[in-house]
């Protein structure tokens, strides 16, 4: 994803980036408390298991970078499908040949896993599952054409969804339905070293654009939550600007749920930058109010998305179970508060 938006989506860009030194080492501004005041927390629903989510993240990385049109990508996709089926979901694969910024035909598969498929009231939980083909934000320019492992930027969001599906199957108490959607072809956007391409923002979130324009199910979810880079060290999740503009009520719902679950320190009320991400076409084309849970590293010069974003360092060594726990438990809080 990128931090500026194309007029295709009819939105004004407002990017908030603060540059200091590249000494953030995966930490957001200040120290993130791993627990909030117990007296004010009122958690509901089952307990999210961060160890399990961590293992799901590692399992995806074990295939290697899940770059479009690669064997690792295809093998991991089959694994994701089987895991969702194992946890009682009805799974559909939405396939399409999509065109990358450079004309490359991308064999895309959106994985749609429906928990409690008979339920009419449904919630969308989504993340992308492909890896960035180029580490074009790496401090070392010799790495710019190497693929990204995408432990955080890809695998972590899918891992949280898999653990949520596992918990929902075991708990058997949630009455609403959940559509878990793994978007493909999110990270084939124009690399920084490529020149001469117009409308570069359109080259991102291709799978989500296809999903939103070719909606695959009869019942649309009431609202949606996008999980993007939800396992990074020291992450905090500011209220993303496009989410505030397009789905303010859902933003309030999610950030209040974080406080109730005991993880408000990970979800400050500050507003971050406006991000071109999968939630934008879902809002604009599918009409589903959807918010983006995405980190905002205030004092990291390398990127406001954190020091590993689109680098060869986006590996398991920088995945934090505490961050996975905060996000996973917050989503459970949202679902069980309906």
Regions found by a protein language model. Give the residues of each.
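Second-shell loop/turn segments in exported
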Residues: 39-47, 62-71, 98-101, 143-155, ...
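Acidic/histidine-rich catalytic neighborhood of metal-dependent amide-processing enzymes
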Residues: 145-249, 274, 278
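Active-site-adjacent substrate-binding region
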Residues: 95, 105, 223, 232-338
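Bacterial signal peptide processing site
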Residues: 25-28
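C-terminal motif of bacterial Sec signal peptides marking the signal peptidase cleavage site
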Residues: 19-23
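N-terminal capping segment at the start of a domain
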Residues: 30-76, 87, 301-318
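A non-catalytic alpha/beta surface segment that caps or lines the substrate-entry region
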Residues: 58-59, 65-118
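Catalytic-core environment of secreted peptidases
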Residues: 50-56, 63, 87, 103, ...
């Amino acid at each position: 994803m990128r931090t500026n938006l194309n007029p295709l989506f009819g939105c004004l860009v407002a990017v908030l980036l603060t540059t200091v030194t590249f000494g953030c080492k995966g930490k957001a501004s200040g120290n993130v408390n791993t627990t909030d005041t117990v007296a004010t927390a009122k958690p509901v629903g089952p307990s999210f298991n961060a160890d399990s989510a961590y293992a799901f993240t590692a399992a995806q990385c074990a295939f290697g970078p899940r770059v479009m049109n690669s064997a690792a990508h295809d093998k991991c996709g089959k694994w994701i499908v089987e895991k969702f089926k194992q946890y009682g979901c009805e799974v559909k694969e939405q396939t399409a040949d999509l065109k990358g910024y450079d004309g490359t035909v991308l064999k895309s598969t959106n994985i749609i896993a429906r928990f409690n498929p008979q339920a009419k009231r449904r919630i969308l939980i989504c993340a992308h599952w492909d890896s960035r083909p180029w580490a074009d934000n790496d401090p070392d320019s010799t790495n710019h054409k190497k693929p990204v492992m995408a432990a955080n930027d890809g695998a972590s969001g899918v891992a949280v969804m898999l653990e949520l599906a596992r918990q929902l199957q075991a708990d058997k108490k949630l009455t609403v339905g959940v559509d878990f959607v793994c978007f493909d072809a999110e990270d084939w956007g124009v690399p920084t070293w490529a020149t001469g391409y117009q409308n570069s923002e359109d080259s991102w979130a291709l799978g989500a654009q296809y999903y939103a324009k070719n909606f695959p199910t009869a019942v649309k979810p009431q609202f949606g939550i996008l999980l993007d880079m939800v396992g990074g060290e020291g992450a905090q999740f500011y209220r993303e600007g496009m989410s505030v503009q397009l789905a303010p009520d859902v933003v309030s719902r999610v950030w209040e749920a974080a406080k109730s679950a005991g993880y408000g320190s990970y979800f400050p009320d500050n507003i971050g930058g406006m991000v071109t991400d999968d939630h934008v076409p879902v809002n604009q084309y599918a009409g589903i109010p959807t918010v983006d849970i995405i980190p905002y590293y205030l004092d990291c010069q390398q990127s406001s998305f954190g020091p590993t974003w689109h680098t060869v360092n986006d590996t398991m060594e920088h995945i934090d179970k505490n961050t996975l726990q905060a996000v996973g438990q917050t989503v459970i809080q949202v679902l069980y508060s309906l």
